[in-house]
């Protein structure tokens, strides 16, 4: 984690604080009735705490991504056995496609896929094909400023989006109430 990729310019993370925050996060999820699987730390992949980038969960399937950051691609192989124990229907994004889960936002049965430094059009098109095979839909949203789609926008249910920066006026989100 200390050697992870960062664009925030905040310096090195405080490892002990991050461990406490992670434990609190797991406890909060468990208090909501969720079953949490905690994987052992892997020094080879310092960004592996961000599991959303390596796998996108669908209602009855999972899409294993192909991260745009080369240093993260091995994480997909590491998390696959854990997901295989939970989900039968597994698809993978293939080269030349790249896709990271931070660029994927689910709104009901539709998925918005950000085209970013980490997710390209080939990866987004593959994801849309997989979504359609599962009875879901997807569309692409070009990013100009943010690292990931969800760096600047989050769906908070009931037609509401929490948006920041370039996402406030995106035509793709005009049907939502922007907060």
Q: Where would I find each of the regions flagged by the language model?
A:
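The feature marks the mature, well-folded catalytic cores of soluble enzymes
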Residues: 1-179
């Amino acid at each position: 984690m200390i050697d992870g990729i960062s664009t925030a310019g905040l310096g090195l993370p405080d490892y002990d604080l991050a461990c406490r925050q992670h434990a609190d996060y797991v406890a909060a999820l468990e208090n909501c009735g969720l079953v949490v699987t905690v994987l052992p730390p892997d020094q080879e992949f310092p960004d592996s705490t961000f599991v959303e980038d390596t796998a996108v969960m669908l209602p009855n399937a999972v899409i294993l991504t192909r991260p745009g950051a080369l240093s993260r691609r091995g994480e997909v192989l590491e998390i696959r056995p854990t997901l295989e124990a939970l989900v039968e229907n597994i698809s993978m994004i293939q080269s030349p496609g790249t896709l990271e889960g931070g660029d994927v936002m689910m709104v009901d049965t539709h998925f918005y896929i950000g085209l970013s430094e980490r997710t390209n059009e080939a990866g987004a098109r593959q994801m849309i094909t997989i979504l359609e095979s599962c009875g879901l839909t997807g569309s692409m949203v070009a990013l100009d400023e943010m690292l990931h789609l969800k760096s600047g926008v989050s769906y908070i249910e009931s037609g509401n989006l929490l948006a920041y920066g370039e996402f406030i006026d995106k035509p793709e989100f005009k049907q939502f109430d922007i907060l």
